[in-house]
């Protein structure tokens, strides 16, 4: 960015100055290993080493580069720096740099070189030119490195923005992020309830009543063509789809499950309509009531058939089913008990001529098949099924 203050040349060149200083191999050997010289040369060389150790190359370049921060250094510091930077070419000739601050330190690089090429005399103009070139080079490197890192940051920022655009709801959505997926189920919340009220095929999922019958079933129009299809046939004229379906897959040989229930215009051959029972009212079966109803066969039609004097054409409630042993139910029409030792389920005895309640009429209009090993719910406070009443009366 153009608003930032660019780093100075000395900051950028600090590491290179350190490397160049240690690669120049400054003389740090003890006195015994130096070549024999005059005593004054030993002292001057020692002073030169001390001055070189206190003056870093960075400070030398600041004084020669004209940055203004170290203007107190004179050309002696330039000569001192020439001796530091050129010792690799001129051997160990640093004997003339004893007084580096007096401005007159002569013979800076005329040491005892071992046949090397004479070094170029460093002037302030050459050092300034070198510093300018190196500063441009270092600033260029700095900008390139900053540019690469800036491009990486921009790419990562763009990718993050794209991810937010893909995952966010967008400007056209009215919901927030938390409600982003709620539209998929808000409209479907009432669908199971509507299916219960409109198409109540309970247990078999629409199999019992051939796709489900309406809530109000006219039992006089219920077709009995599916009643003689076996023990596990389809529902009683479509009532199987409403009350629970029983086993609506048709195990008794009925190839088409809904064949007998789909047409309600067939003439009724129900066993109660054959016996001239007044069962013309509609039965209102509520959808939440789920009781498995199985169809009776023609063999067991005499078990549940009760004389029509015990029925009253009243509006019905839900039928409650009792457990009736098959032997007692079979012996009820003939009046003979084939199994006298078997205890009867009901302790209370109702007179068959007693006028039944409205629930008895509902139970009478729903033809039932009582299995021998199945317990049916029987609250004894309400009533006894007419077949049970007849069976207990015959006993």
From Swiss-Prot:
Record's subcellular location: Nucleus; Cytoplasm, Perinuclear region
Disordered: annotated segments: 27-120, 164-188, 194-213, 250-274, 332-361
Keywords: Biological rhythms, Cytoplasm, Nucleus, Phosphoprotein, Repeat
Gene Ontology biological process terms, A to Z: circadian regulation of gene expression; entrainment of circadian clock by photoperiod; negative regulation of transcription by RNA polymerase II
GO molecular function, one term: transcription cis-regulatory region binding
Composition-biased stretches (Gly residues): 93-114, 201-213, 250-261
Organism, as annotated: Drosophila equinoxialis (Fruit fly)
Biological role stated in the UniProt entry: Essential for biological clock functions. Determines the period length of circadian and ultradian rhythms; an increase in PER dosage leads to shortened circadian rhythms and a decrease leads to lengthened circadian rhythms. Essential for the circadian rhythmicity of locomotor activity, eclosion behavior, and for the rhythmic component of the male courtship song that originates in the thoracic nervous system. The biological cycle depends on the rhythmic formation and nuclear localization of the TIM-PER complex. Light induces the degradation of TIM, which promotes elimination of PER.
Keyword Nucleus: yes
Record's GO cellular component terms: nucleus; perinuclear region of cytoplasm
Name the UniProt record assigns to this protein: Period circadian protein
The keyword rRNA processing is annotated on this UniProt entry: no
Subunit details: Forms a heterodimer with timeless (TIM); the complex then translocates into the nucleus.
Modification comment: Phosphorylated with a circadian rhythmicity, probably by the double-time protein (dbt). Phosphorylation could be implicated in the stability of per monomer and in the formation of heterodimer per-tim.
């Amino acid at each position: 960015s153009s608003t930032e203050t660019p780093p100075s040349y000395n900051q950028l060149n600090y590491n290179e100055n350190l490397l160049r200083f240690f690669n120049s191999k400054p003389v740090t050997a003890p006195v015994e290993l130096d070549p024999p010289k005059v005593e004054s040369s030993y002292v001057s060389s020692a002073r030169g080493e001390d001055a070189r150790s206190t003056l870093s190359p960075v400070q030398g370049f600041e004084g020669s580069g004209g940055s203004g921060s170290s203007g107190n250094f004179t050309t002696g510091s330039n000569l001192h720096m020439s001796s530091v930077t050129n010792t690799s070419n001129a051997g160990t000739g640093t004997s003339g740099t004893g007084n580096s601050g007096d401005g007159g330190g002569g013979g800076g690089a005329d040491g005892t070189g071992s046949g090397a090429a004479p070094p170029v005399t460093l002037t302030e103009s050459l050092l300034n030119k070198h510093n300018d070139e190196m500063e441009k080079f270092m600033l260029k490197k700095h900008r390139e490195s900053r540019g690469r890192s800036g491009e990486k940051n921009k790419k990562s920022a763009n990718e993050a923005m794209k991810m937010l655009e893909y995952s966010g709801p967008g400007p056209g959505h009215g919901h927030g992020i938390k409600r982003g997926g709620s539209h998929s189920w808000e409209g479907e919340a009432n669908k199971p309830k509507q299916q219960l009220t409109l198409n109540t095929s309970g247990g078999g999922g629409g199999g019992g009543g051939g796709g489900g019958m309406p809530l109000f079933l006219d039992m006089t129009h219920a077709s009995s063509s599916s009643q003689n299809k076996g023990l596990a046939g389809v529902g009683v004229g479509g009532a199987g789809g409403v009350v629970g379906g029983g086993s609506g897959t048709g195990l008794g040989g009925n190839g088409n499950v809904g064949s007998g229930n789909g047409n309600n215009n067939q003439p009724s051959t129900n066993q109660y309509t054959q016996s001239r029972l007044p069962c013309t009212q509609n039965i209102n079966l509520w959808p939440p009531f789920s009781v498995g109803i199985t169809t009776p066969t023609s063999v067991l039609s005499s078990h549940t058939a009760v004389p029509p004097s015990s029925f009253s054409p009243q509006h019905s409630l839900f039928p409650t089913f009792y457990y009736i042993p098959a032997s007692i139910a079979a012996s009820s029409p003939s009046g003979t008990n084939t199994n006298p030792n078997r205890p009867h389920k009901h302790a209370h005895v109702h007179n068959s001529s007693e006028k039944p309640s409205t629930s008895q009429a509902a139970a009478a209009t729903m033809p039932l098949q009582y299995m021998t090993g199945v317990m049916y719910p029987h609250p004894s406070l309400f009533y006894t099924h007419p077949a049970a009443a007849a069976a207990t009366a015959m006993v």
